[in-house]
A protein has these predicted regions:
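Bacterial N-terminal signal peptides that target proteins for export
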Residues: 1-9
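Sequence-pattern detector for short linear motifs
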Residues: 9, 43-45
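Repetitive helical segments and hydrophobic/amphipathic motifs
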Residues: 11-15, 102
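N-terminal signal peptide c-region/cleavage motif recognized by signal peptidases
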Residues: 17-19
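SH3-family beta-barrel domains
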Residues: 21-43, 54-58, 65-142, 147-156
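Short boundary/loop segments of OB/S1/cold-shock single-stranded nucleic-acid-binding domains
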Residues: 48-52
Length: 156
């Protein structure tokens, strides 16, 4: 019985610490994304510090620029910096369209047929980037986008 309780306590503790979220031990800077529908950026690495931003956009890409315990200093796509708890972050590779409009193409190449267009500010998931092109998924609409039209985990 003690063994079962001890195991459950350990599982809960690992889950609360964020498990494999936000790449502990990874050299900075590195890419992460928001794992929650709402996430607060704070002016310092503690719940005692006030929030300077509240994000309401799951999968928004962020760049982790500093690590302090369970806190990550992040930079958002607009350049704002602040601190977030590791539980609010994920290693899911995402990006945001920074061009006015980015065609999602059937294949990686300028001559490939454009399937969709993603407007500036659209967030999607990445499933790989190579030779200047990224496989970009926006809520099930998939295509290849030029990496220089995106901000996020395009260097993986």
């Amino acid at each position: 019985m003690k063994q079962c309780v001890r195991g459950a306590t350990m599982a809960i503790a690992l889950n609360m610490a964020g498990g494999a979220l936000a790449a502990p031990g990874k050299p900075v800077p590195y890419w992460a994304s928001l794992s929650q529908d709402e996430a607060r950026m704070r002016v310092g690495p503690s719940l005692d510090y006030p929030s300077n931003w509240v994000y309401r956009r799951r999968d928004l890409p962020v760049k982790v620029v500093q690590v302090l315990g369970l806190w990550r200093k992040i930079e958002d796509p607009d350049g704002a910096q602040g601190w977030m708890h590791v539980r609010l972050l994920s290693d899911t590779p995402t990006a945001i369209v920074k061009a006015d409009a980015a065609p999602l193409r059937q294949a990686a190449g300028d001559g490939a047929m454009a399937l969709f267009r993603a407007e500036k500010g659209v967030v999607g998931r990445l499933s790989g980037c190579a030779s200047g092109w990224c496989n970009f998924d926006v809520k099930g609409q998939r295509g290849f986008v030029k990496a220089d039209q995106l901000w996020g985990a395009t260097d993986k």
